Protein backbone atom coordinates (compact mmCIF):
# COMPACT_ATOMS: atom_id res chain seq x y z
CA UNK A 1 0.00 0.00 0.00
CA UNK A 2 1.35 3.36 -1.03
CA UNK A 3 0.89 5.99 1.69
CA UNK A 4 0.15 9.44 0.30
CA UNK A 5 2.45 12.08 1.81
CA UNK A 6 0.81 14.81 3.85
CA UNK A 7 0.54 18.16 2.14
CA UNK A 8 1.84 20.74 4.62
CA UNK A 9 0.80 24.32 4.49
CA UNK A 10 3.17 27.28 4.66
CA UNK A 11 2.35 27.85 8.32
CA UNK A 12 3.14 24.23 9.26
CA UNK A 13 6.43 24.37 7.39
CA UNK A 14 7.42 27.61 9.11
CA UNK A 15 6.59 26.16 12.57
CA UNK A 16 8.62 23.00 11.91
CA UNK A 17 11.60 25.09 10.76
CA UNK A 18 11.49 27.14 13.95
CA UNK A 19 11.29 24.01 16.14
CA UNK A 20 14.12 22.31 14.25
CA UNK A 21 16.33 25.33 14.92
CA UNK A 22 15.85 24.80 18.66
CA UNK A 23 16.76 21.08 18.55
CA UNK A 24 13.34 19.51 18.14
CA UNK A 25 12.97 16.32 16.13
CA UNK A 26 9.90 14.57 14.82
CA UNK A 27 8.24 12.31 17.37
CA UNK A 28 9.35 14.32 20.39
CA UNK A 29 6.85 16.07 22.61
CA UNK A 30 6.86 19.74 23.42
CA UNK A 31 8.06 21.17 26.69
CA UNK A 32 11.13 20.93 28.86
CA UNK A 33 10.44 17.32 29.78
CA UNK A 34 9.26 16.50 26.24
CA UNK A 35 5.93 15.21 27.52
CA UNK A 36 3.73 17.55 25.46
CA UNK A 37 1.88 17.01 22.22
CA UNK A 38 3.76 15.35 19.39
CA UNK A 39 1.48 16.43 16.55
CA UNK A 40 0.39 19.90 15.62
CA UNK A 41 -3.14 21.07 16.18
CA UNK A 42 -5.19 21.25 13.02
CA UNK A 43 -8.31 23.21 12.37
CA UNK A 44 -11.26 21.17 11.15
CA UNK A 45 -14.39 22.53 9.58
CA UNK A 46 -17.67 21.80 11.38
CA UNK A 47 -20.16 20.69 8.76
CA UNK A 48 -23.01 19.35 10.92
CA UNK A 49 -25.80 20.72 13.11
CA UNK A 50 -24.64 19.13 16.40
CA UNK A 51 -23.43 21.18 19.31
CA UNK A 52 -19.83 21.72 20.29
CA UNK A 53 -18.36 18.63 22.01
CA UNK A 54 -21.06 16.27 20.77
CA UNK A 55 -19.84 12.75 20.02
CA UNK A 56 -22.09 11.10 17.43
CA UNK A 57 -20.51 7.65 18.15
CA UNK A 58 -21.47 7.79 21.83
CA UNK A 59 -24.55 5.68 21.14
CA UNK A 60 -22.36 2.78 20.17
CA UNK A 61 -19.54 3.25 22.66
CA UNK A 62 -21.52 4.09 25.82
CA UNK A 63 -22.40 0.83 27.69
CA UNK A 64 -24.88 2.16 30.21
CA UNK A 65 -25.78 -1.24 31.66
CA UNK A 66 -22.19 -1.84 32.62
CA UNK A 67 -22.02 1.50 34.45
CA UNK A 68 -25.29 0.80 36.27
CA UNK A 69 -24.03 -2.61 37.48
CA UNK A 70 -20.83 -1.08 38.74
CA UNK A 71 -22.71 1.63 40.71
CA UNK A 72 -25.02 -0.90 42.42
CA UNK A 73 -22.12 -3.17 43.23
CA UNK A 74 -20.27 -0.30 44.81
CA UNK A 75 -23.25 0.51 47.07
CA UNK A 76 -23.46 -3.08 48.38
CA UNK A 77 -21.47 -3.96 51.49
CA UNK A 78 -20.89 -7.61 52.48
CA UNK A 79 -20.53 -8.19 56.23
CA UNK A 80 -19.62 -11.53 57.79
CA UNK A 81 -20.69 -12.17 61.36
CA UNK A 82 -21.66 -14.94 63.80
CA UNK A 83 -25.03 -15.23 62.15
CA UNK A 84 -23.52 -15.54 58.76
CA UNK A 85 -23.02 -13.30 55.81
CA UNK A 86 -25.11 -10.17 55.51
CA UNK A 87 -25.42 -7.83 52.53
CA UNK A 88 -26.19 -4.18 53.30
CA UNK A 89 -26.67 -1.34 50.88
CA UNK A 90 -25.44 2.12 51.67
CA UNK A 91 -28.21 4.62 52.28
CA UNK A 92 -28.61 7.59 50.00
CA UNK A 93 -28.81 9.98 52.98
CA UNK A 94 -25.21 9.38 53.95
CA UNK A 95 -23.99 10.33 50.54
CA UNK A 96 -25.82 13.69 50.54
CA UNK A 97 -24.97 16.82 52.48
CA UNK A 98 -27.60 18.59 54.56
CA UNK A 99 -28.02 22.20 53.39
CA UNK A 100 -30.77 24.04 55.32
CA UNK A 101 -33.05 26.09 53.14
CA UNK A 102 -32.97 29.83 53.78
CA UNK A 103 -36.01 31.48 55.34
CA UNK A 104 -37.72 33.56 52.66
CA UNK A 105 -39.76 35.57 55.17
CA UNK A 106 -38.61 39.20 55.49
CA UNK A 107 -36.02 38.78 52.80
CA UNK A 108 -35.05 42.44 52.49
CA UNK A 109 -36.80 43.75 55.62
CA UNK A 110 -35.76 43.39 59.23
CA UNK A 111 -38.34 42.53 61.90
CA UNK A 112 -37.79 44.98 64.73
CA UNK A 113 -40.80 44.27 66.96
CA UNK A 114 -44.25 42.66 67.09
CA UNK A 115 -47.42 44.64 67.77
CA UNK A 116 -49.64 43.39 70.59
CA UNK A 117 -52.53 44.84 72.59
CA UNK A 118 -50.14 45.89 75.31
CA UNK A 119 -47.63 47.47 72.93
CA UNK A 120 -44.56 46.55 70.95
CA UNK A 121 -42.34 43.66 71.90
CA UNK A 122 -38.83 44.07 70.59
CA UNK A 123 -37.08 41.17 68.96
CA UNK A 124 -34.52 39.64 71.30
CA UNK A 125 -32.40 38.22 68.57
CA UNK A 126 -31.93 41.65 67.03
CA UNK A 127 -31.01 43.18 70.38
CA UNK A 128 -28.37 40.56 70.98
CA UNK A 129 -27.03 41.05 67.49
CA UNK A 130 -26.96 44.84 67.89
CA UNK A 131 -25.06 44.53 71.20
CA UNK A 132 -22.50 42.30 69.55
CA UNK A 133 -22.18 44.75 66.68
CA UNK A 134 -21.67 47.67 69.04
CA UNK A 135 -18.99 45.79 70.90
CA UNK A 136 -17.28 44.62 67.76
CA UNK A 137 -17.42 47.90 65.81
CA UNK A 138 -15.13 50.02 67.93
CA UNK A 139 -13.69 53.14 66.34
CA UNK A 140 -10.02 52.67 65.46
CA UNK A 141 -7.42 54.93 66.94
CA UNK A 142 -6.40 57.92 64.81
CA UNK A 143 -2.63 58.19 64.92
CA UNK A 144 -1.07 61.63 65.03
CA UNK A 145 1.94 62.68 62.99
CA UNK A 146 4.26 62.19 65.93
CA UNK A 147 2.94 58.68 66.54
CA UNK A 148 3.41 57.83 62.86
CA UNK A 149 6.99 59.10 62.98
CA UNK A 150 7.69 56.99 66.02
CA UNK A 151 6.13 53.93 64.40
CA UNK A 152 8.14 54.51 61.20
CA UNK A 153 11.31 55.29 63.19
CA UNK A 154 11.62 58.80 61.77
CA UNK A 155 11.39 57.75 58.12
CA UNK A 156 9.24 59.76 55.70
CA UNK A 157 8.46 59.66 51.99
CA UNK A 158 10.99 62.44 51.47
CA UNK A 159 14.17 60.42 51.02
CA UNK A 160 16.41 63.48 51.08
CA UNK A 161 15.40 64.12 54.69
CA UNK A 162 17.39 61.03 55.70
CA UNK A 163 20.47 62.88 54.56
CA UNK A 164 19.56 66.04 56.48
CA UNK A 165 17.96 67.95 53.58
CA UNK A 166 14.68 69.25 54.97
CA UNK A 167 12.13 71.72 53.58
CA UNK A 168 11.69 74.03 56.56
CA UNK A 169 11.22 77.19 54.45
CA UNK A 170 8.58 75.60 52.27
CA UNK A 171 6.71 74.18 55.25
CA UNK A 172 6.77 77.57 56.99
CA UNK A 173 5.41 79.27 53.86
CA UNK A 174 2.62 76.70 53.58
CA UNK A 175 1.68 77.20 57.24
CA UNK A 176 1.52 80.97 56.69
CA UNK A 177 -0.75 80.48 53.68
CA UNK A 178 -3.04 78.18 55.67
CA UNK A 179 -3.29 80.68 58.51
CA UNK A 180 -4.08 83.50 56.09
CA UNK A 181 -6.76 81.41 54.41
CA UNK A 182 -8.38 80.51 57.74
CA UNK A 183 -8.30 84.14 58.86
CA UNK A 184 -9.92 85.20 55.59
CA UNK A 185 -12.69 82.66 56.10
CA UNK A 186 -13.36 83.92 59.63
CA UNK A 187 -13.30 87.55 58.45
CA UNK A 188 -10.26 88.53 60.47
CA UNK A 189 -7.18 90.34 59.22
CA UNK A 190 -4.29 87.92 58.89
CA UNK A 191 -1.28 88.68 61.04
CA UNK A 192 1.21 86.96 58.75
CA UNK A 193 2.16 88.62 55.46
CA UNK A 194 -0.02 87.41 52.63
CA UNK A 195 1.43 86.29 49.35
CA UNK A 196 0.12 88.05 46.27
CA UNK A 197 -1.60 84.97 44.96
CA UNK A 198 -4.59 86.76 43.60
CA UNK A 199 -4.04 87.96 40.07
CA UNK A 200 -5.00 91.54 39.27
CA UNK A 201 -8.03 91.98 37.00
CA UNK A 202 -7.04 92.76 33.42
CA UNK A 203 -7.24 96.22 31.96
CA UNK A 204 -9.78 95.20 29.35
CA UNK A 205 -12.39 94.55 32.02
CA UNK A 206 -11.78 98.01 33.50
CA UNK A 207 -12.26 99.64 30.11
CA UNK A 208 -15.48 97.74 29.52
CA UNK A 209 -16.78 98.78 32.94
CA UNK A 210 -15.97 102.42 32.24
CA UNK A 211 -17.71 102.27 28.87
CA UNK A 212 -20.78 100.70 30.45
CA UNK A 213 -20.86 103.35 33.18
CA UNK A 214 -20.54 106.14 30.61
CA UNK A 215 -23.31 104.63 28.48
CA UNK A 216 -25.57 104.34 31.51
CA UNK A 217 -24.87 107.95 32.48
CA UNK A 218 -25.61 109.23 28.97
CA UNK A 219 -28.77 107.11 28.81
CA UNK A 220 -29.99 108.52 32.14
CA UNK A 221 -29.29 112.09 30.96
CA UNK A 222 -31.19 111.46 27.74
CA UNK A 223 -34.15 110.05 29.64
CA UNK A 224 -34.25 113.13 31.87
CA UNK A 225 -34.09 115.43 28.85
CA UNK A 226 -36.76 113.40 27.05
CA UNK A 227 -39.12 113.73 29.99
CA UNK A 228 -38.65 117.49 29.99
CA UNK A 229 -38.70 118.01 26.20
CA UNK A 230 -40.54 115.26 24.30
CA UNK A 231 -40.01 117.03 20.94
CA UNK A 232 -36.25 116.96 21.38
CA UNK A 233 -36.53 113.31 22.32
CA UNK A 234 -38.10 112.44 18.98
CA UNK A 235 -35.38 114.38 17.16
CA UNK A 236 -32.66 112.61 19.12
CA UNK A 237 -34.19 109.23 18.30
CA UNK A 238 -34.26 110.10 14.61
CA UNK A 239 -30.65 111.29 14.73
CA UNK A 240 -29.52 108.14 16.49
CA UNK A 241 -31.30 106.01 13.86
CA UNK A 242 -29.65 107.99 11.07
CA UNK A 243 -26.23 107.59 12.71
CA UNK A 244 -26.74 103.85 13.00
CA UNK A 245 -27.73 103.60 9.35
CA UNK A 246 -24.71 105.65 8.28
CA UNK A 247 -22.44 103.55 10.43
CA UNK A 248 -23.79 100.33 8.90
CA UNK A 249 -23.55 101.75 5.38
CA UNK A 250 -19.98 102.84 6.06
CA UNK A 251 -19.06 99.34 7.21
CA UNK A 252 -20.61 97.80 4.11
CA UNK A 253 -18.88 100.29 1.83
CA UNK A 254 -15.52 99.67 3.54
CA UNK A 255 -15.91 95.93 3.02
CA UNK A 256 -16.81 96.44 -0.62
CA UNK A 257 -13.88 98.80 -1.14
CA UNK A 258 -11.54 96.27 0.42
CA UNK A 259 -12.75 93.55 -1.91
CA UNK A 260 -12.71 95.82 -4.97
CA UNK A 261 -9.22 97.09 -4.15
CA UNK A 262 -7.89 93.56 -4.03
CA UNK A 263 -9.48 92.79 -7.37
CA UNK A 264 -8.25 96.05 -8.88
CA UNK A 265 -4.67 95.37 -7.78
CA UNK A 266 -4.81 91.95 -9.40
CA UNK A 267 -6.37 93.22 -12.64
CA UNK A 268 -4.38 96.49 -12.87
CA UNK A 269 -1.54 95.00 -14.90
CA UNK A 270 -3.87 93.21 -17.28
CA UNK A 271 -6.44 95.98 -17.78
CA UNK A 272 -4.01 98.90 -18.32
CA UNK A 273 -3.66 98.18 -22.04
CA UNK A 274 -7.39 97.62 -22.42
CA UNK A 275 -8.21 100.92 -20.69
CA UNK A 276 -6.00 102.84 -23.08
CA UNK A 277 -7.62 101.13 -26.08
CA UNK A 278 -11.11 101.85 -24.77
CA UNK A 279 -10.27 105.54 -24.31
CA UNK A 280 -8.85 105.72 -27.83
CA UNK A 281 -11.90 104.00 -29.26
CA UNK A 282 -14.21 106.42 -27.47
CA UNK A 283 -12.34 109.43 -28.87
CA UNK A 284 -12.36 107.90 -32.36
CA UNK A 285 -16.08 107.19 -32.13
CA UNK A 286 -16.83 110.74 -31.01
CA UNK A 287 -14.78 112.13 -33.93
CA UNK A 288 -16.55 109.86 -36.39
CA UNK A 289 -19.98 110.85 -35.10
CA UNK A 290 -19.09 114.54 -35.41
CA UNK A 291 -17.88 114.06 -38.97
CA UNK A 292 -21.04 112.14 -39.90
CA UNK A 293 -23.25 114.88 -38.47
CA UNK A 294 -21.34 117.53 -40.44
CA UNK A 295 -21.75 115.54 -43.65
CA UNK A 296 -25.49 115.15 -43.16
CA UNK A 297 -25.84 118.89 -42.44
CA UNK A 298 -23.93 119.80 -45.60
CA UNK A 299 -26.02 117.43 -47.72
CA UNK A 300 -29.30 118.77 -46.31
CA UNK A 301 -28.21 122.37 -46.90
CA UNK A 302 -27.26 121.59 -50.49
CA UNK A 303 -30.53 119.78 -51.15
CA UNK A 304 -32.45 122.69 -49.63
CA UNK A 305 -30.58 125.11 -51.92
CA UNK A 306 -31.52 122.98 -54.94
CA UNK A 307 -35.19 122.95 -53.90
CA UNK A 308 -35.22 126.73 -53.43
CA UNK A 309 -33.61 127.17 -56.85
CA UNK A 310 -36.35 125.04 -58.48
CA UNK A 311 -39.13 127.03 -56.82
CA UNK A 312 -37.70 130.46 -57.89
CA UNK A 313 -38.11 132.26 -61.12
CA UNK A 314 -37.61 130.26 -64.33
CA UNK A 315 -35.30 132.65 -66.20
CA UNK A 316 -32.87 133.28 -63.37
CA UNK A 317 -33.31 129.72 -62.12
CA UNK A 318 -31.93 128.20 -65.30
CA UNK A 319 -28.52 129.77 -64.73
CA UNK A 320 -28.51 128.96 -61.00
CA UNK A 321 -29.53 125.34 -61.53
CA UNK A 322 -26.70 124.82 -63.98
CA UNK A 323 -24.21 126.19 -61.42
CA UNK A 324 -25.67 124.04 -58.64
CA UNK A 325 -25.66 120.96 -60.87
CA UNK A 326 -22.04 121.54 -61.76
CA UNK A 327 -21.18 121.88 -58.04
CA UNK A 328 -23.22 118.81 -57.13
CA UNK A 329 -21.51 116.88 -59.91
CA UNK A 330 -18.14 117.85 -58.44
CA UNK A 331 -19.25 117.19 -54.85
CA UNK A 332 -19.78 113.40 -55.17
CA UNK A 333 -16.22 112.89 -56.31
CA UNK A 334 -14.89 114.92 -53.40
CA UNK A 335 -17.18 113.03 -51.00
CA UNK A 336 -15.92 109.68 -52.22
CA UNK A 337 -12.32 110.74 -51.77
CA UNK A 338 -12.99 112.04 -48.25
CA UNK A 339 -14.79 108.86 -47.24
CA UNK A 340 -12.01 106.68 -48.58
CA UNK A 341 -9.45 108.71 -46.63
CA UNK A 342 -11.50 108.50 -43.43
CA UNK A 343 -11.95 104.74 -43.79
CA UNK A 344 -8.22 104.30 -44.31
CA UNK A 345 -7.52 106.38 -41.16
CA UNK A 346 -10.03 104.33 -39.14
CA UNK A 347 -8.46 101.08 -40.31
CA UNK A 348 -4.98 102.35 -39.41
CA UNK A 349 -6.17 103.33 -35.93
CA UNK A 350 -7.76 99.91 -35.39
CA UNK A 351 -4.60 98.14 -36.58
CA UNK A 352 -2.50 100.21 -34.18
CA UNK A 353 -4.88 99.45 -31.30
CA UNK A 354 -4.70 95.72 -32.01
CA UNK A 355 -0.89 95.86 -32.16
CA UNK A 356 -0.72 97.61 -28.76
CA UNK A 357 -3.04 95.04 -27.23
CA UNK A 358 -1.01 92.15 -28.60
CA UNK A 359 2.28 93.78 -27.52
CA UNK A 360 1.50 95.16 -24.04
CA UNK A 361 -1.68 93.33 -22.93
CA UNK A 362 -1.21 90.69 -20.24
CA UNK A 363 -4.51 88.90 -20.77
CA UNK A 364 -4.65 87.49 -24.26
CA UNK A 365 -8.17 86.11 -23.98
CA UNK A 366 -9.70 89.50 -23.13
CA UNK A 367 -7.73 91.30 -25.85
CA UNK A 368 -8.84 88.72 -28.42
CA UNK A 369 -12.47 89.07 -27.40
CA UNK A 370 -12.23 92.88 -27.62
CA UNK A 371 -10.49 92.75 -31.00
CA UNK A 372 -13.17 90.34 -32.31
CA UNK A 373 -15.91 92.72 -31.19
CA UNK A 374 -14.13 95.67 -32.78
CA UNK A 375 -13.57 93.82 -36.04
CA UNK A 376 -17.27 92.96 -36.17
CA UNK A 377 -18.23 96.56 -35.50
CA UNK A 378 -15.78 97.77 -38.15
CA UNK A 379 -17.22 95.28 -40.67
CA UNK A 380 -20.75 96.52 -39.95
CA UNK A 381 -19.61 100.12 -40.35
CA UNK A 382 -17.89 99.31 -43.64
CA UNK A 383 -21.05 97.64 -44.92
CA UNK A 384 -23.09 100.70 -43.93
CA UNK A 385 -20.60 103.01 -45.68
CA UNK A 386 -20.71 100.85 -48.80
CA UNK A 387 -24.52 100.90 -48.84
CA UNK A 388 -24.54 104.67 -48.47
CA UNK A 389 -21.96 105.04 -51.24
CA UNK A 390 -24.01 102.80 -53.54
CA UNK A 391 -27.10 104.93 -52.88
CA UNK A 392 -25.15 108.11 -53.57
CA UNK A 393 -23.59 106.62 -56.72
CA UNK A 394 -27.01 105.71 -58.06
CA UNK A 395 -28.20 109.20 -57.27
CA UNK A 396 -25.17 110.77 -58.92
CA UNK A 397 -25.63 108.67 -62.05
CA UNK A 398 -29.28 109.69 -62.25
CA UNK A 399 -28.36 113.31 -61.67
CA UNK A 400 -25.62 113.10 -64.33
CA UNK A 401 -27.99 111.65 -66.94
CA UNK A 402 -30.57 114.30 -66.16
CA UNK A 403 -27.94 117.04 -66.44
CA UNK A 404 -26.77 115.83 -69.84
CA UNK A 405 -30.34 115.67 -71.10
CA UNK A 406 -31.00 119.16 -69.73
CA UNK A 407 -27.86 120.60 -71.34
CA UNK A 408 -28.81 119.12 -74.72
CA UNK A 409 -32.43 120.18 -74.51
CA UNK A 410 -31.58 123.67 -73.13
CA UNK A 411 -30.45 124.86 -76.55
CA UNK A 412 -33.64 123.48 -78.23
CA UNK A 413 -36.65 124.83 -76.41
CA UNK A 414 -37.43 126.54 -73.11
CA UNK A 415 -40.56 124.44 -72.57
CA UNK A 416 -38.58 121.24 -72.32
CA UNK A 417 -36.24 122.97 -69.88
CA UNK A 418 -39.20 124.00 -67.74
CA UNK A 419 -40.54 120.43 -67.63
CA UNK A 420 -37.13 119.04 -66.66
CA UNK A 421 -36.75 121.73 -64.00
CA UNK A 422 -40.14 120.73 -62.61
CA UNK A 423 -39.11 117.03 -62.57
CA UNK A 424 -35.68 117.69 -61.04
CA UNK A 425 -36.88 118.82 -57.59
CA UNK A 426 -39.07 115.68 -57.36
CA UNK A 427 -35.98 113.49 -57.85
CA UNK A 428 -34.09 115.55 -55.29
CA UNK A 429 -36.93 115.11 -52.83
CA UNK A 430 -36.84 111.35 -53.41
CA UNK A 431 -33.09 111.42 -52.70
CA UNK A 432 -33.70 113.32 -49.46
CA UNK A 433 -36.29 110.75 -48.39
CA UNK A 434 -33.82 107.90 -49.01
CA UNK A 435 -31.19 109.75 -46.97
CA UNK A 436 -33.63 110.13 -44.08
CA UNK A 437 -34.46 106.42 -44.24
CA UNK A 438 -30.76 105.56 -44.07
CA UNK A 439 -30.42 107.84 -41.01
CA UNK A 440 -33.29 106.09 -39.22
CA UNK A 441 -31.78 102.66 -39.94
CA UNK A 442 -28.45 103.75 -38.48
CA UNK A 443 -30.12 105.06 -35.31
CA UNK A 444 -31.98 101.78 -34.84
CA UNK A 445 -28.76 99.80 -35.26
CA UNK A 446 -26.89 102.00 -32.76
Swiss-Prot record:
GO cellular component, one term: nucleolus
Regions that span the bilayer: none
Keyword Acetylation: yes
Cross-link named Glycyl lysine isopeptide (Lys-Gly) (interchain with G-Cter in SUMO2), sites: 46
Biased composition (Basic and acidic residues): 219-237, 249-268, 297-328, 363-375, 392-409
Compositionally biased region (Basic residues): 238-248, 416-427, 437-446
Modified residues (N-acetylmethionine): 1
Annotated positions of the Phosphothreonine modification: 4, 116
Annotated keywords: Acetylation, Coiled coil, Isopeptide bond, Phosphoprotein, Ubl conjugation
Name by which UniProt lists this protein: G patch domain-containing protein 4
